[in-house]
Each structure stands twice: as structure tokens, then as C-alpha cells.
């Protein structure tokens, strides 16, 4: 298990004036997208146990209902509809061989959902699509070659010479890792404009209940579908580009002795999920050391003085870290709001939260 800390400044705040340096990477636009279909978390247990033909598992259903009620998630957007599940019944059992079916759907749908977010980011950026020099695509949903980056290049009509990088199976750490990677690419390629796209669809992890695997119920409750995109570059052109955030620094740390705490494993039945009960506590116990290393060069040690874009892996993680750091209730407000409205969006989650932070800041003129 690893943590990534990225130091950002907003371009309208006083702290931006303090740290802004020519040549630093800046986020120039953000776009997000979700499937039109969505589920209400309060009624989802009824749907889930009905569509998987598991209504006879009454105790298990009540357990799932309690998990959903405690999740602090209001709704989630899902590509999976009742019609799609009825056409593909192998997705509704727990361990039936179904990887081919899942892959066939994901290979097509992941780039399409990514395109929606990318087009929104490109529109906000306001520059010709031909000026995009790099494409980084990230997903935990499916694996193929040519990859989703190649398919998105064709869907968007990017230059055939665009420099592409495909990132598969990076999990929840991927959102912050994409910020780090985009910063490195932008600052190493002066004048370049990097399109970063994170697109996640949970078809690979959806399956019927298992009496032996409680982790599966958590996965069915927690994850949602969505895509997010951003344009990153250095030295914005006056009157042509409007920077939103500046990427000051980024660091990644492996937490010792956590190899088995959080795992996604690809099997013939799809992607299986394991999350140790210790994850919230372990993250809370280790996060401050990471923060100290990241912010000490800038003389910052008051964690309530900074704005937070915290990946909300789950409500218990948010609560535990907030308590451990002594944060005020508003510090994680954007993270909690995204978790409530979309669930855990894996790699796309951090960019959704960035978008939420900038929208709230603009609304409040902060």
C-alpha cells in the first residue's frame, strides 16, 4: 500500500502568489463525466440481491443494507443497467468464468467514457486539439492492446504523433500519481500540453454475493463509474489559457508491511477485491509523516491551513485521518461530497475532487 502527496496551489489564492514559479506545471482545465444510469444507495440492496437471484440470503442482504447505510454514499453512477445484466447473467454469479464478457464491454466503454470528460476539459481549455502533445490514460478497468489510450486518440482525432502512455491497474493511488506524472511530463517538455484521462467502470468487480467473502459486499457498495480529464502545461499563454492549480511538488511513499492490506487480483471471474479492516488505521498512523516531508520545505505544519484534495477510499478512512490530524470539519468537505454523490471512483476520484474544490472556490470567490 502506498501514499502519494502532491503539493498544489490555487491560482486565485494568496498562497499561489507566494509560491508561483515560472516553469512549474499548471492544471489548465478539468472535465468530468459519468454514465447517465445511477443507483440510489438506500434501495440498491434490494436491486442487487434481486438481479443476482440471491433474495433467499436474507441475513446477507441485511448485512449489505447496513454496509450501504454506513457508507455515507447517496448515489453512484453505473454503466451496468438491469438490461445489460439480464443479457449477461454470468456477471451476476459470484465465481462463474466471465472475464471475456467483462473485457468485451470494458474495452469499448472505458475509452468512450474517457472521451466525454476529455472533450469537456478541451472545451474549457479553449485551444485547438492539435496543440495536445501528450496523452496519459489511466484505468483499473480492463486490459487490452492496442490500449484505451490508442482508442481515445482515434475517438478524439488527436495527432497521430501524440506521445501516449497507458497506465493499467493502478487502483486508488492512481489519481494522485497522475498529478505527479503530468507534472514531470509538462516540466520536461517545455511548451507541451498534456491531456490526462482517468476512466473507471466497475463491471470487472461486479458479481453476486458470497457467504465466505465479506470484502465482496464492500466492493459492491463502494465503487462507482466515472471519468475525469485535465490539461496540464507550463507557462500559460496570457489571455489564451487560464491556470486553475499549480503543481508545486509530489512524493510517493510505500507504507511498510502493508503488502496484503489492499489487493485487486485479476481472475477468470473478473477482478477480486480485498481490503483489510486495518486500512483506515494504518493510513491514519502514517499520513502525517508523509505530510511533514512534503510541506516542510515550504514552512507549513498547520494541516488546517491548507486545502485538501483527499482520496476518500471509504467513509471510515476519511473519518480516521480527519481525527488523527485534528482537521476541522470543512477540510475534507469536497472529498466527502464527491464520495456521497459518486462513490469511490478509483483513479478518477482525485480529479473529481479537484473540480469540486475549484467550483466551490469560484462560487465563494476564494
Curated annotation (Swiss-Prot):
Pathway: Secondary metabolite biosynthesis; flavonoid biosynthesis. GO terms for biological process: flavonoid biosynthetic process; polyketide biosynthetic process. CDD domains: CHS_like (cd00831). Keywords: Acyltransferase, Flavonoid biosynthesis, Transferase. GO terms for molecular function: naringenin-chalcone synthase activity. Its EC number is 2.3.1.74. The keyword Acyltransferase applies. The active site is at residue 172. PROSITE patterns: CHALCONE_SYNTH. It is an enzyme of class 2 (transferase). It catalyses: (E)-4-coumaroyl-CoA + 3 malonyl-CoA + 3 H(+) = 2',4,4',6'-tetrahydroxychalcone + 3 CO2 + 4 CoA. PANTHER family: CHALCONE SYNTHASE, HYDROXYMETHYLGLUTARYL-COA SYNTHASE. The primary product of this enzyme is 4,2',4',6'-tetrahydroxychalcone (also termed naringenin-chalcone or chalcone) which can under specific conditions spontaneously isomerize into naringenin. Belongs to the thiolase-like superfamily. Chalcone/stilbene synthases family. This is Chalcone synthase B. The gene is CHSB.
Amino acid at each position: 500500500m502506498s501514499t502519494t502527496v502532491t503539493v498544489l496551489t490555487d491560482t486565485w489564492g494568496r498562497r499561489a502568489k507566494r509560491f508561483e514559479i515560472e516553469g512549474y506545471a499548471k492544471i489548465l482545465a478539468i472535465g468530468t463525466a459519468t454514465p447517465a444510469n445511477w443507483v440510489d444507495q438506500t434501495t440498491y440492496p434490494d436491486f442487487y440481491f434481486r438481479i443476482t437471484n440471491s433474495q433467499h440470503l436474507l441475513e446477507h442482504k441485511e448485512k449489505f443494507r447496513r454496509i450501504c447505510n454506513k457508507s455515507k454514499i447517496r448515489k453512484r453512477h453505473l454503466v451496468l443497467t438491469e438490461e445489460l445484466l439480464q443479457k449477461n447473467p454470468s456477471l451476476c454469479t459470484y465465481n462463474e468464468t466471465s472475464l471475456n464478457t467483462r473485457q468485451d464491454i470494458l474495452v469499448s466503454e472505458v475509452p468512450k467514457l474517457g472521451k466525454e470528460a476529455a472533450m469537456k476539459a478541451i472545451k474549457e481549455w479553449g485551444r485547438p486539439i492539435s496543440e495536445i502533445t501528450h496523452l496519459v490514460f489511466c484505468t483499473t478497468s480492463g486490459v487490452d492492446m492496442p490500449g484505451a489510450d490508442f482508442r481515445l486518440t482515434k475517438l478524439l482525432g488527436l495527432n497521430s504523433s501524440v506521445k501516449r502512455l497507458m497506465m493499467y491497474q493502478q487502483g486508488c493511488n492512481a489519481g494522485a500519481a497522475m498529478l505527479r506524472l503530468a507534472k514531470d511530463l509538462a516540466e520536461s517538455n517545455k511548451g507541451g500540453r498534456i491531456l490526462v484521462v482517468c476512466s473507471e467502470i466497475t463491471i470487472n468487480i461486479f458479481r453476486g454475493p458470497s457467504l465466505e467473502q465479506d470484502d465482496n459486499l464492500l466492493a459492491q457498495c463502494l465503487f462507482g463509474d466515472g471519468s475525469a480529464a485535465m490539461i496540464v502545461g507550463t507557462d500559460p499563454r496570457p489571455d489564451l489559457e487560464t491556470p486553475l492549480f499549480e503543481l508545486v511538488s509530489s512524493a510517493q511513499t510505500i507504507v511498510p508491511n502493508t503488502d496484503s492490506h489492499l489487493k485487486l487480483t485479476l481472475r477468470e471471474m473478473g477482478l477480486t477485491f480485498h481490503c483489510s479492516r486495518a486500512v483506515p488505521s494504518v493510513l491514519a498512523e502514517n499520513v502525517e509523516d508523509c505530510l511533514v516531508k512534503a510541506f516542510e520545505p515550504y514552512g507549513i505544519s498547520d494541516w488546517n491551513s491548507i486545502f485538501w484534495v483527499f482520496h476518500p477510499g471509504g467513509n471510515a478512512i476519511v473519518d480516521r485521518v480527519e481525527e488523527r490530524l485534528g482537521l476541522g470539519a470543512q477540510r475534507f468537505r469536497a472529498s466527502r461530497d464527491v464520495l456521497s454523490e459518486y462513490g469511490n471512483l478509483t483513479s478518477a476520484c482525485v480529479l473529481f475532487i479537484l473540480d469540486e474544490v475549484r467550483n466551490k472556490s469560484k462560487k465563494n470567490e476564494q
